[in-house]
UniProtKB/Swiss-Prot annotation:
Name by which UniProt lists this protein: DNA ligase
UniProt xrefs under Pfam families: DNA_ligase_A_C, DNA_ligase_A_M, DNA_ligase_A_N
Catalytic reaction equation(s): ATP + (deoxyribonucleotide)n-3'-hydroxyl + 5'-phospho-(deoxyribonucleotide)m = (deoxyribonucleotide)n+m + AMP + diphosphate
Gene Ontology MF annotations: ATP binding; DNA binding; DNA ligase (ATP) activity; metal ion binding
Functional summary from the UniProt entry: DNA ligase that seals nicks in double-stranded DNA during DNA replication, DNA recombination and DNA repair.
The family this protein is said to belong to: Belongs to the ATP-dependent DNA ligase family.
Needed co-factor(s): Mg(2+)
Keyword Metal-binding attached: yes
The species this protein was found in: Pyrobaculum islandicum (strain DSM 4184 / JCM 9189 / GEO3)
Length: 584
């Protein structure tokens, strides 16, 4: 496929505000693609070269990209920087530079065969792989060769891609729907395969080649989509939901981790499927010592502890582990422990379809607890009062609460169902719990907030429609440093119109691709005609909103937008709140 064909589709996707139109455009694109290039097309649409856990990064900042454009066009760096400053878009700067190049003889566009998708992808992969002495010059030369062959519109999307600002915001579920339509594959079967092996490029090539999805198996080294939990704040309701019996375990305030062991090699993946092994060399060593298996996939929570007292510390302390050049120091200053709670695979045996109680037994058989690795504390209950006692014990020890699970439940990858239920209480607020919401818009600040965003439009996610519905406008709880950080975090996702996956009655000053997730709390959840979350579910014409919302200070960088609080969770919180508020 010619790269120009892909670019036409990207431009059309970027300009639409309708998700159905987006799906049709992508379906048409996939039908035209050859099997050997469809994986590359998928990666390009997603803004990545490889799946997230492979950690392939281009390592190209705006200045380096502009140097490559300058080399290809003869337009000076100062002129390009002025264009970039004026447009705020490195892609637009590249497009305009190629449209008005001072030395068009440098450009090969129109003088040879058009760029192919595979040529662009393979060149960008070489850019990502360039390392060591002279790597920067190599990256510039490779990119310049692409810009020299590209049309102005092609250059726009190449530039955006290499600096990580493609701005399309196409969700994995949208791509799955388009692949299903393009190749006549059952959508639910494709979703199941994606949950097991969440590499859409590989799956797209698999179906394009006409191979059966049954060949896709759980594989050590490839993270599966994590199973997620609903939430309730009553032990009796939890027991009723779980059929009268529950496995209750401590809910630790840490980082959820999927641990893969294969032939002595340990990999650690985040809930966003990113490889975070580099941050936890001590956990890698501890897993090798504690787990007796050749191959295994386990789940647990990595928790920071006080090196002097051994007491558990808040999740935020783990942020010290994220600075790659300071990990060795952080290991000493911010030690961690791993609390395991599930076993998904062991030596060729897929356990995800086995009941939880069986998986727990197998977990205890393969894990030898040590100072650094333990099995999360758990018990089986059939009495609500006993659950409450266990809950208060957990909270008194610094836990967030409990996670209560059906003993007979299988591991539902990627699902947020009622087989796992969080039992949490926030005693500092009238709201039962905090919520994790996605920033979809912003309002310009005034006074001392001038030049930044003063408030943000937040939304909850609906997995049934793959859309985001607004819940509140929040401006409280942000320090000056927070507002500056939010501005910087959101700039790469700024778009000229409402995103096709966002449903909103409010019109903010700025729209964003749904990407950034933050934690919010408020006084209560109320009915509101201004917001679209659960619109019409409680009362015709009105949705749910958070009254007096406040940012807690916690950036949920560990969560993807699709892992944010769902609309069903919002309505459950609203119902629970009403039950508490109304005397019996």
């Amino acid at each position: 496929m010619q790269f120009g064909e892909l670019v036409k589709t990207l431009a059309a996707v970027e300009s639409t505000t309708q998700r159905t139109t987006m799906v049709k455009l992508l379906t048409s694109l996939f039908k035209k693609a050859r099997p050997e290039e469809i994986d590359k097309i998928i990666y390009f649409v997603l803004g990545d070269l490889r799946p997230p856990w492979e950690g392939v990064e281009l390592g190209v900042a705006e200045k380096l990209c502009l140097r490559a454009v300058s080399k290809a066009t003869g337009v000076s760096i100062s002129e390009l920087e002025a264009l970039y400053k004026k447009t705020g878009d490195v892609g637009e700067a590249a497009r305009k530079a190629l449209s008005t190049a001072k030395r068009p003889g440098l450009l090969a566009f129109g003088q040879q065969k058009p760029l192919e998708v595979s040529e662009v992808y393979d060149t960008l992969l070489k850019v990502a792989q360039a390392s060591g002495e002279g790597a920067q010059d190599m990256k510039i030369s490779l990119l310049a060769s692409l810009f020299a062959k590209a049309s102005p519109e092609e250059a726009k999307y190449i530039a955006r891609f290499v600096v990580g600002k493609l701005r399309l915001g196409v969700a994995d579920m949208t791509l799955i729907e388009a692949l299903s339509d393009a190749f006549g594959v059952d959508k639910e079967a494709l979703e199941r395969a994606y949950h097991i092996y969440p590499d859409l490029g590989k799956l797209a090539r698999h179906v394009a080649e006409g191979r059966p999805l049954e060949e896709i198996k759980i594989t050590p080294g490839v993270p599966v989509l994590p199973m997620l939990a609903q939430r309730l704040s009553s032990s009796s309701e939890i027991l009723a939901k779980l059929g009268g019996s529950a496995i209750c375990e401590y809910k630790y305030d840490g980082e959820r981790a999927q641990i893969h062991l294969k032939e002595g090699v340990v990999k650690i993946f985040s809930r966003r499927l990113e490889d975070i092994t580099h941050a936890y060399p001590d956990v890698v060593k501890a897993v090798r010592e504690a787990v007796s298996a050749r191959e295994a996939i386990l789940e647990g929570e990595i928790v920071a502890i006080d090196p002097d007292t051994g007491d558990m510390l808040p999740f935020q302390e783990l942020m010290h582990r994220k600075r790659k050049h300071e990990v060795a120091v952080a290991v000493e200053m911010y030690p961690v422990v791993l609390n395991l709670f599930d076993l998904l695979y062991i030596d060729g045996e897929d356990l995800t379809n086995e009941p939880l109680i069986y998986r727990r037994v197998r977990l205890s058989e393969v894990v030898q607890e040590t100072e650094k690795v333990s099995i999360a504390k758990w018990r089986v209950f059939d009495d609500a009062e006993e659950i409450d006692v266990f809950f208060h014990e957990a909270v008194s020890l610094g836990m967030e609460g409990l996670v209560c699970k059906s003993p007979t439940s299988v591991y539902e990858m990627g699902a947020r169902g009622w087989n796992w239920i969080k039992y949490k209480r926030d005693y500092k607020s009238e709201m039962i719990d905090t919520v994790d919401l996605v920033v979809v818009g912003a309002f310009y600040g005034r006074g001392k907030r001038a030049g930044l965003y003063g408030a943000f439009l937040l939304a909850a996610y609906d997995p049934a429609t793959d859309m985001f519905y607004t819940v509140c406008k929040v401006g409280s709880g942000f320090t000056d440093a927070d507002l500056k950080k939010m501005y910087e975090m959101l700039q790469p996702y700024k778009i000229p119109h409402r995103h096709p996956r966002v449903v909103s009655k409010m019109e903010p000053d700025v729209w964003f691709t749904p990407q950034v997730v933050i934690e919010v709390i408020g006084a209560e959840i109320t009915l509101s005609p201004l917001h679209t979350c659960c619109l019409g579910a409680v009362k015709p014409g009105v949705g749910l909103a958070i009254r007096f919302p406040r940012f807690t200070g916690r950036y949920r960088t560990d969560k993807s937008p699709e892992q944010a609080t769902t609309v069903s969770e919002m309505i459950e919180l609203y119902k629970r709140q009403k039950k508490v508020a109304q005397p019996e």
